[in-house]
Amino acid sequence: GRVAEVAFARGLPTPAEMAGALGAVPGHLGMLVETGAIVARLLARGVRISTRTIVTRACGSDALTSVELTRVDAHWRPAGSPRVCAADTLVLGYGFSPSTELARQAGCELDWDSPRGGWVVRHDERMATTAEGIFVAGEPTGVAGADQSRAEGTLAGLAVAQELRPASALGDALARATRQVEAASRFSTVVQRVFEPDRAGLARLAEPETTVCRCELVTRGRLTDALQANPFLSTANAAKLECRSGMGPCQGRYCEGTVAAIVAAERDQPIRESGRFAAQ
């Protein structure tokens, strides 16, 4: 099939954002060149690339037939009339969510960090979590890419080895691993900041008939009705118990963030105050 359009919800990077990203370029030039080549190839084949544009509706009865796209402002609020693009396939992506279920069940404390994906496992400079004897690396610390995951894995492994054998001469190796994590983090932090989704903006786009939880077929309207009927319902987990959102096979992997954002909007509170689903 033919790609009709690639739409980005955010605008082009500002001069200040570009200047702030310069420190992340060393060591990652190849990745930037590859990205530029992909964009050039799309443009050469006539693919439209739009910025400040978001999908506001997918249309069709038994199958997708068209997509409605709308210009948005800096906070992802529709700022123009929608246009329709014929399509039989739609791919959406608004960031990644770290898998932290095992860490939660093990008693590790989490922190809310929206650019890194939402709820991430708290750890120290050696990748040790708040739960004794448990170290963490990769995705649970925040979605940061393969390079940082490998570097964190090396650092965590060395830290575990040193803890098991304190007399081991691992000082130099630990220092190198720490520098590798720091270098990878400089790049990932820029990418995370530039492409952080506007979670409140996404929640606003959901209409009453929009399916929020696909596993249990819970709509935005059903969730809103429950929140309005119960003024003391103020967390994502409470909404889960009330509406069954997040009780399906995926256990909230797809809907937890949306439910938390909707609860936050209805209760006029930060998304972090909505909490998270209990890990099962």
Each language-model region and where it sits:
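Residues forming the flavin
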Residues: 1-243, 249, 253-262, 266-278
